[in-house]
Amino acid sequence: MKISQLFIGLVACSAVFSHAAIEGASSNNANIKVGSAANASHPGGAAAVSVQAAGAPYNAFTGFSSLKGLAQAFAAQGTSNTNVTVGTKTFNISHIPVSAMPASHSALGNFNFGQVGSQEVYFGEWWKAGDTPASASHTVYYAGDNTNTTVPTSGTATYTVAGINGSATNLLSGNLTANFGAGTLQGSLTGTGTAVSSLTLNGVAFNPGTAQFAGAASANGTAGVNNSGVVQGHFFGANAAALAGIAQFNNAAYNTAFGGAKN
């Protein structure tokens, strides 16, 4: 089966929404939206993504689990799906370049996204065909199943975190520390080979009742230091077993998505 036929099938089947409690965000909803979808032909996941910039019929929600299957099936066309170890944690990283699509499907653009272990928690990036991750279309996003999520109200925990910025192979990595009593999240990620060489969370706070966090970020990279970053994200799972979020900058090349697992 051609990749175009498979992708159309996935999109068509994903039009029915699931009842899972999906939390997530995008740095540009005109390009990418996240949500929930039940895919009868390709079950196994609840979190989904929509390429809003593509228009109908390609802008229906498609489950990340289905996109993972596509990335696994078409390696000969340039896609990839790989398990990557960061510290002691495993992240599943998918790469679907527009070059793997026929010209008629170029509006679907380029995808890099990761999954935190086997949890229904995803984070990634997208940019238009003909653009690069340094272009204004560079959009980052995260989505996860919020069912049964609980957040402690005391104690601390560290998270091993992977970040995606312009590459599915050169990942950022680092540790974030949550102080559940104070409601703060802090730490940094570093890497090479992307626009961002370091990303630091500044003044990020959360409410255990909502499991959401927000604050500021600074980054250093190919365009120097950028202090304009805005961070948003969410804890997922029992006792905040995982997290995911995005850092958005006035220079879209610095936009970064990240996800992490509790140590």
Q: How would you describe each model-predicted region?
A:
Residues A20-N263:
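Mature soluble binding/inhibitory domains
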